[in-house]
């Protein structure tokens, strides 16, 4: 007879007395396989959302592809989104239940809000009346106040990310661009989740099961996906070996790892291969680690920005790839006989393939690397290595009947696809595009993406950046502007802000320049303005009164004021930032249309390399001690006036705005050699119309060794763990925020983000002001045909206030004004809103209990029709599943 719970406890306690002991199975960690797919809901810029079911409860499951996040250099943002949702326990923020992952995807399991998003509701209503808008803005303001008090900045606030609950209340979601500040360098822990600061007496609504807590504190493993069943190899090859996963001693199989006290299946999941040892006793694991560790150091394939993410998460099963939730992109693996492993099949013996069949093949080092490489493309692996690859991948051979139920989302058509909003060079692969052209397969990128990897990572050092002639960055990129809308969040690739300059301010001093970089096809008078290479986006202010300092500079870029048109140059080669644009235009005859009067040119790599060697005398005299460097003023303050006053302070100086292209990578150098050049201080750069300075002073580490490059040291350089970041000694002003990229939806970006200034919670209040205007009028205040024009409208604060019968009330217009204040230090926040006349009738203490103007009336609990309006507006056709 089955013992009762009390009997179990008694038998457990009486083990010493000889009573019968009942074995209690150890609970398994939560898995995505426990959820059933119902239907897709919607799609965003960085992931897809599906309706999932576990038991009798429905969940919204956000699926993010690891490969996409690695390619976009946004792995830290997925971690930030998980942390922000896990830390938040507010009635106005979506609740996160699980954070799961597989070899290829990350799954955020959240509560499903059946009312859809506010953007869809706004499309149906057209615009909201003032009372309705005030209620929605009030609840969002409380959510923002909660986040800011807990060190979280949303940074992507917009109606699309406001969901409507069953009772009609607002909840914020999509923290993919958020910033989480914990005032420490470690990830969130269990205490952060169980006892958040605002919950002195936690409510039952926010309680979590042990499995949920375990999933939320697990480390997200953003290594590149490996062969199924070969996850242990990544641990073995890691620079640090976990105590729970020590490297097996002696002559063992490369896959053998002795894990103790893990899951009940660990003894069956991790086995040594005696056949392998017997057949090849001279190839122990130690023979492989040195080479593969060197490859990892060069290619950074199995680590993220945080050292704590080096290991594969304990929540990720060793041979678990969730076939029901993801589609295997390597179809050739099935042809080779490899199968994916799930919890259903973990009890099957490992290494079922006989090793005797391989004894006739040469077990050389390259084949082992192919078998143990973190990622590979089995379709292009040489035949000599296929058997070893299959050995490492073939963990089991059974029960794949349910694998046919794969998620099919290839019918999600987007005429306004996210890739269209990425302003990319024409030859660079768009992240969301369907595939790679043949010509691109031969060009190796610094990011190890599946389509491009066709050999061992231990081959020659991969070139970090393409040469400049591989980019066609003029007409094609500008042509895509005309058809773009600005509703999607995306990464701004080539942000071009036209900055006015004085027509009479001519700083070109051609005679004092020792040597100049001029294209062989151009005269010195028409030399292109170079990009300013800096590790963070910055706005550089010219000082044209210090021409005498150019005598000490070895080379310069020349431009003439005779050329009055805006200039944009995309220079790659060994430059730090491919795709950075500098645009200058005269005060007179200025047009805001980026398609007009733009001259673009590029410096060919061959010409640059010919000019790179610098004599010792030049490098020593780059900047003498006694010379005071030109100051780089924060000209952002000059942009703080309304549109009628913006141009006035800019007429005395000429400004150049340099912005990073988002196809360039942060810390993207794959080279393991020490830096050939440290990024020199901006003190040594004369940022004038003749951008002077020795060219190598702004070069980041490259893949190619150049013995003729001189070393230049930055004064008082601070040693850093990451040698490829800008040293702190050369940074001016406020500490840089994150990686300096501009992320978000153009219409809702705050001016400080566009101007690359340090930003804080004020960016969310700016976005709230944009949302308030949009609720009252139906369109965002800075909306325009192209993102470029939107950015100009934001910087000018060009707001088209409704007139006549559509005129907003004085209180509403005043509320928008105080939120849309250019100066972030004077921008309104929660305190100002509570005392504003527009919100005088709001009961801030009982907002979650107030009656809302719109309450969803779905057909059933799986109804997703409230999301359709937004999907249709963005031309998203969400298909079902092909089972």
From Swiss-Prot:
It is found in: Cytoplasm, Cytoskeleton, Microtubule organizing center, Centrosome; Nucleus. Keywords: Acetylation, ATP-binding, Cell cycle, Cell division, Cytoplasm, Cytoskeleton, Kinase, Mitosis, Nucleotide-binding, Nucleus, Phosphoprotein, Serine/threonine-protein kinase, Transferase. Residues 1-23, 298-317, 511-530, 569-597, 706-737 are annotated as: Disordered. ATP binds at residues 41-49, 62. It catalyses: L-seryl-[protein] + ATP = O-phospho-L-seryl-[protein] + ADP + H(+); L-threonyl-[protein] + ATP = O-phospho-L-threonyl-[protein] + ADP + H(+). This is Serine/threonine-protein kinase greatwall. One of its GO terms (biological process) is cell division. GO terms for molecular function: ATP binding; protein phosphatase 2A binding; protein serine kinase activity; protein serine/threonine kinase activity.
């Amino acid at each position: 007879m089955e013992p009762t719970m009390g009997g179990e406890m008694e038998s457990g306690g009486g083990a010493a007395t000889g009573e019968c002991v009942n074995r209690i199975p150890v609970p398994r960690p939560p898995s995505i396989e426990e959820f059933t797919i119902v239907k897709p809901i919607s799609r965003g810029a960085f992931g897809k959302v599906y309706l999932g079911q576990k038991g009798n409860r429905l969940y919204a499951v956000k699926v993010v592809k690891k490969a996409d996040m690695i390619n976009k250099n946004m792995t830290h943002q997925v971690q930030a989104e998980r942390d922000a949702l896990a830390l938040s326990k507010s009635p106005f923020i979506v609740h996160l239940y699980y954070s799961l992952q597989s070899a290829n995807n990350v799954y955020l399991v959240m509560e499903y809000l059946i009312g859809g998003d506010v953007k869809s509701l706004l499309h149906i209503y057209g615009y909201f009346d003032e009372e309705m808008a005030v209620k929605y803005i009030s609840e969002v303001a409380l959510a923002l106040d909660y986040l800011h008090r807990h060190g979280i900045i949303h940074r992507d606030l917009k109606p699309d990310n406001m969901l409507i609950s069953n009772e009609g209340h607002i909840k914020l979601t999509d923290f993919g661009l958020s910033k989480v500040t914990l005032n420490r360098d470690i990830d969130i822990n269990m205490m952060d989740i169980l006892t958040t600061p605002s919950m002195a007496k936690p409510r039952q609504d926010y309680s979590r099961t042990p499995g949920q807590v375990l999933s939320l504190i697990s480390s997200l493993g953003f290594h590149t996906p490996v062969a199924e069943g070969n996850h242990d190899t990544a641990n073995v090859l890691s620079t640090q070996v976990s105590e729970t996963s020590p490297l097996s001693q002696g002559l063992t199989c490369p896959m053998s790892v002795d894990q103790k006290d893990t899951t009940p299946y660990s003894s069956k999941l991790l086995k040594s291969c005696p056949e392998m040892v017997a057949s090849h006793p001279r190839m122990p694991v130690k023979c492989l680690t040195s080479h593969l560790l060197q490859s990892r150091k060069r290619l950074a394939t199995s680590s993220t920005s945080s050292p704590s993410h080096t290991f594969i998460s304990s929540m990720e099963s060793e041979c678990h790839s969730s076939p029901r939730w993801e589609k295997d992109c390597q179809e050739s693996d099935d042809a080779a006989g490899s199968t994916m492993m799930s919890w259903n099949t973990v009890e099957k013996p490992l290494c079922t393939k006989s090793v005797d069949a391989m004894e006739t093949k040469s077990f050389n080092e390259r084949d082992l690397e192919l078998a143990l490489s973190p990622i590979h493309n089995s379709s292009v692996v040489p035949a000599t290595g296929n058997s070893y690859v299959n050995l490492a991948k073939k963990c089991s051979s059974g029960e794949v009947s349910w694998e046919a139920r794969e998620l099919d989302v290839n019918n999600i058509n987007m005429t306004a696809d996210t890739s269209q909003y990425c302003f990319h060079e024409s030859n660079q692969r768009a992240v969301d595009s369907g595939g790679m052209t043949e010509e691109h397969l031969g060009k190796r990128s610094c990011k190890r993406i599946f389509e491009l990897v066709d050999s061992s990572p231990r081959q020659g050092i991969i070139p970090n950046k393409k040469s400049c002639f591989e980019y066609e960055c003029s007409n094609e990129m500008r042509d895509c502007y005309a058809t773009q809308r600005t509703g999607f969040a995306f990464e701004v690739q080539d942000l071009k802000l036209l900055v006015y300059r004085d027509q009479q301010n001519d700083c070109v001093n051609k005679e004092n320049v020792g040597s100049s970089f001029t294209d062989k096809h151009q005269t010195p008078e028409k030399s292109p303005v170079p990009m300013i290479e800096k590790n963070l986006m910055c706005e550089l202010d010219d000082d044209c009164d210090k021409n005498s300092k150019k005598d000490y500079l070895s080379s310069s870029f020349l431009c003439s004021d005779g050329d009055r048109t805006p200039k944009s140059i995309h220079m790659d080669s060994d430059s730090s930032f491919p795709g950075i644009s500098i645009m200058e235009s005269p005060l007179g005859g200025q047009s805001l249309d980026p398609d007009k009067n733009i001259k673009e040119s590029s410096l060919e790599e061959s010409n640059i390399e010919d000019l790179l060697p610098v004599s010792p005398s030049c490098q020593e005299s780059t900047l003498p001690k006694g010379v005071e460097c030109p100051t780089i003023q924060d000209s952002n303050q000059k942009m703080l006036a309304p549109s009628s006053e913006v141009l006035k302070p800019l007429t005395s100086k000429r400004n150049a705005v340099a912005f990073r292209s988002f196809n360039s990578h942060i810390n993207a150098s794959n080279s393991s050699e020490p830096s050939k050049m440290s990024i020199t201080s901006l003190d040594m750069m004369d940022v004038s119309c003749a951008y002077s300075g020795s060219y190598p002073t702004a070069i980041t580490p490259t893949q190619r060794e150049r013995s003729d490059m001189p070393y230049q040291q930055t004064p008082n350089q601070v040693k850093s763990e990451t040698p490829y970041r800008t040293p702190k000694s050369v940074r001016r002003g406020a500490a840089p925020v994150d990686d300096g990229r501009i992320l978000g939806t153009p219409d809702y970006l705050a001016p400080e983000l566009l101007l690359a200034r340090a930003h804080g919670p004020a960016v969310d209040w700016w976005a709230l002001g944009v949302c308030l205007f949009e609720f009252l009028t139906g369109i965002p205040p800075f909306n325009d045909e192209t993102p470029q024009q939107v950015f100009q409208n934001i910087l000018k604060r060009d707001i088209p206030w409704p007139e006549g019968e559509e005129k907003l009330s004085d209180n509403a217009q005043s509320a928008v004004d105080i939120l849309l204040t250019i100066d972030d230090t004077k921008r309104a926040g929660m305190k100002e809103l509570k005392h504003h006349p527009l919100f005088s009738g709001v009961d801030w203490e009982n907002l979650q209990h107030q009656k809302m103007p719109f309450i969803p009336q779905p057909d059933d609990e799986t109804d997703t029709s409230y999301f359709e309006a937004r999907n249709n507006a963005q031309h998203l056709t969400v298909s079902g599943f092909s089972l």
